[in-house]
Amino acid sequence: MGQLGALLHLVDPTLPIGGFNHSNGLETFVQQGKVNSRASLEEYVQTQLMQNWIYNDGAYLSLAFDAMANHDLGRLLQLDQELAASKIARESREGSYKLGVRLLKIFIRYENHPLLSEFQQAVSEKRCQGYFPIVFAMVAQAMNLDKAETLYAFYYNAAVGVVTNGVKLVPLSQMDGQDILFALRTPLAQAVENSLNPDLDWLGAATLASDIRSMQHEQLYTRLYMS
């Protein structure tokens, strides 16, 4: 039960890290009329899951989890730098490392793991940025959480964020949002299975539509979100 409690704390939407401030380009998709219904929002989140997250944030989380288990700080720093290079849009890039640094600041108070302290020092010395998936993986492994459950929680948390923002932006009913999340159960499990041992040839695969909308978001006349 202790591990379940730790995992729930890690994905708690009330964590004061500012995740609710980011749409990662979804706001642009909505303003352009690309996402305008329950069906299009469901297609959007499933596309993000199976064509973006499993090759980017989820894959890097998986690799960072293994590096943390091997006490390999050098590999963690390398993964953080590679993830930085894969995040083309400035707002999404900055948003991710701000979330990561805040998450680390919270959980380093509870987990006495030397790599967390060393990584925080590396962030302070600007040897890395501290991207959210990397820090999430490090904290989860420091708490001895199961890798598959960590990946599922990470993906579910990301999906909830997209659906919550989509329901607000389109707008849709709360029940529409719940139906979308229910339909994600099988895709989420598949994404976890695909991410346990990421295919390095697909690491950082481009997501052009999302990257373009994320960059266009900087120029929107009105917006609710920071990315």
Curated annotation (Swiss-Prot):
Native source species: Actinobacillus pleuropneumoniae serotype 3 (strain JL03)
GO MF term (any one): nickel cation binding
Family from the record: Belongs to the UreF family.
Functional description taken from the UniProt entry: Required for maturation of urease via the functional incorporation of the urease nickel metallocenter.
Subcellular location(s) per record: Cytoplasm
Pfam families: UreF (PF01730)
Subunit structure: UreD, UreF and UreG form a complex that acts as a GTP-hydrolysis-dependent molecular chaperone, activating the urease apoprotein by helping to assemble the nickel containing metallocenter of UreC. The UreE protein probably delivers the nickel.
Keyword Cytoplasm: yes
Any GO CC annotation of this UniProt entry: cytoplasm
Gene expressing this chain: ureF
Keywords, in A-Z order: Chaperone, Cytoplasm, Nickel insertion
Protein name: Urease accessory protein UreF
